[in-house]
């Protein structure tokens, strides 16, 4: 992986080429990971519904899983090799051993271990006793996945960690020069969380829908595998497809419950994920229900007109009740005076409430900082200052020219009068 040092435009081209290669490698790795997971699901379902007549097909499926796993490990090693080359290009290194840190080596080993977990075809089917003797009647499969084989099969779902990596490289953020330059100026790192926030802002509905459906289907199948040989009937896929959404939505009718420890753990994790997705959904809906900038300005303008009108009406009502109270007090009509005094106090209270609402609205409007408006104001102020400065410079230059002309006039006017003085002194 070492080589000559590449600088300037060649380094930029090399970086772009390495990122393109990383994108293709991450995409193919995700395809192989998905193929392996699909074959694993096919093997488990064939093992449950099939008999000894499907033993050869099951063995072939396991061999295909092993081949896809080997190819996936090769792609992961190639991807990290490209990452090391990219780091060398960015930092101007020649020795790859300097770029490969201990943490990165541990990450590579961990990824290889995680992606290498799969049910390997190490032994034949248990129902085949004599390979030379033909089977006269198909026997039912003696059991489902063993505990070790089930754990290895479910561990293949850990390969889904390749999805954020492929999405990051396919998003075009790392390949876009504008993103990189602006991000470098603002010290923003373009990692997986940035892409997640980007898609959450641009396509929140699609992202939440895909995430929710993916979690439902995955956890429903995992729960069916965990509960497949339990005493109750929770292991059927139809029951788990009902139990998982109910647990995900934190409803829990209680008509279907898990019977095994692994099933209870899956339901617990499903409830936690459901709470998190519900919080995301509430945040998205609340943001969608908010006014945008134009709607907020229109609403505030109309509310300002309404509060101003109410303030005028309240002030007029205060004056009216004050006059009525004064008139009935002068006439010694105590009953009517008390009635209008109560109305006067109520009108004063209403006027104060409306004025307080209007003041809060004004404070809210003033607290809304309009960036574009402030930019325009500052730009106009700068233009005015620049024009004033140029006008002042012109006036100073004009004044300097007039002073020079005045000096020349004075010198020409006083020069002939001062010349005869030496001759007169000589006489």
From Swiss-Prot:
SUPFAM superfamilies, per database record: Small-conductance potassium channel (SSF81327), Voltage-gated potassium channels (SSF81324)
Intramembrane segments per UniProt: 241-261
Impact noted for substituting residue 352 to H: In DHS2; no effect on plasma membrane localization; increases calcium-activated potassium channel activity
Entry membrane topology: Multi-pass membrane protein
Keyword Transcription regulation applies: no
Record field: transmembrane: 29-49, 59-79, 108-128, 143-163, 207-227, 265-285
Protein induction: Up-regulated by phorbol myristate acetate (PMA) and phytohemagglutinin (PHA) in T-cells.
Record's comment on post-translational modification: Phosphorylation at His-358 by NDKB activates the intermediate conductance calcium-activated potassium channel activity, and conversely it's dephosphorylation by PHPT1 inhibits this activity.
Post-translational modification Phosphohistidine, affected residues: 358
Self-association and partners: Homodimer. Homotetramer. Heterotetramer of potassium channel proteins. Interacts with MTMR6; this interaction leads to selective dephosphorylation of PI(3)P in a lipid microdomain adjacent to KCNN4, resulting in a decrease of intermediate conductance calcium-activated potassium channel activity. Interacts (via the C-tail domain) with CALM1; the calmodulin binding is constitutive, does not require calcium and mediates calcium-dependent gating and four calmodulin molecules bind to one channel tetramer.
Protein name from the UniProt record: Intermediate conductance calcium-activated potassium channel protein 4
Organism: Homo sapiens
Gene label: KCNN4
């Amino acid at each position: 992986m070492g080589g000559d040092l590449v600088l300037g435009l060649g380094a930029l081209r090399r970086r772009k080429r390495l990122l393109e290669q990383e994108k293709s490698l991450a995409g193919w790795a995700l395809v192989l990971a998905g193929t392996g997971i699909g074959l694993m699901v096919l093997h488990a379902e064939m093992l449950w519904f099939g008999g000894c007549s499907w033993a050869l097909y099951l063995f072939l499926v396991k061999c295909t899983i092993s081949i896809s796993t080997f190819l996936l490990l090769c792609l992961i090693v190639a991807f990290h090799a490209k990452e090391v080359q990219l780091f060398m290009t960015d930092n101007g290194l020649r020795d790859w051993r300097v770029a490969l840190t201990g943490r990165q080596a541990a990450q590579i080993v961990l990824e290889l271990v995680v992606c290498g977990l799969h049910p390997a075809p190490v032994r034949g089917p248990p129902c085949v006793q004599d390979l030379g003797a033909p089977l006269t009647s198909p026997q039912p499969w003696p059991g489902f996945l063993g505990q070790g084989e089930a754990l290895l099969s479910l561990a293949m779902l850990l390969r889904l960690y390749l999805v954020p990596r492929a999405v990051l490289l396919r998003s075009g953020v790392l390949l876009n020069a504008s993103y990189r330059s602006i991000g470098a100026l603002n010290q923003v790192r373009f990692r997986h969380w940035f892409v997640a926030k980007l898609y959450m802002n641009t396509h929140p509905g699609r992202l939440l829908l895909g995430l929710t459906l993916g979690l439902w289907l995955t956890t429903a199948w995992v729960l069916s595998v965990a509960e497949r040989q339990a005493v109750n009937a929770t292991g059927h896929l139809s029951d788990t497809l009902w139990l998982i959404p109910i647990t995900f939505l934190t409803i829990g009718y209680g008509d279907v419950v898990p019977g095994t420890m692994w099933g209870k753990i899956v339901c617990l994790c499903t409830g936690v994920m459901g709470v998190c997705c519900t919080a995301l959904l509430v945040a998205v809906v609340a943001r969608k229900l908010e006014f945008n900038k134009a709607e907020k300005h229109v609403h505030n303008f109309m509310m300002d007109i309404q509060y101003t009108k109410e303030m005028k009406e309240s002030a007029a009502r205060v004056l009216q009740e004050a006059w009525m109270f004064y008139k009935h007090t002068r006439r010694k009509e105590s009953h009517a005076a008390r009635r209008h005094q109560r109305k006067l106090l109520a009108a004063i209270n209403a006027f104060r409430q409306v004025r307080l609402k209007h003041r809060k609205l004004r404070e809210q409007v003033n607290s809304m900082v309009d960036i574009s408006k402030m930019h325009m104001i500052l730009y106009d102020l700068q233009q005015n200052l620049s024009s004033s400065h140029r006008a002042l410079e012109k006036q100073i230059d004009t004044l300097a020219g007039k002073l020079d002309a005045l000096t020349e006039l004075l010198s020409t006017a006083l020069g002939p009068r001062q010349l005869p003085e030496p001759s007169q002194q000589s006489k």
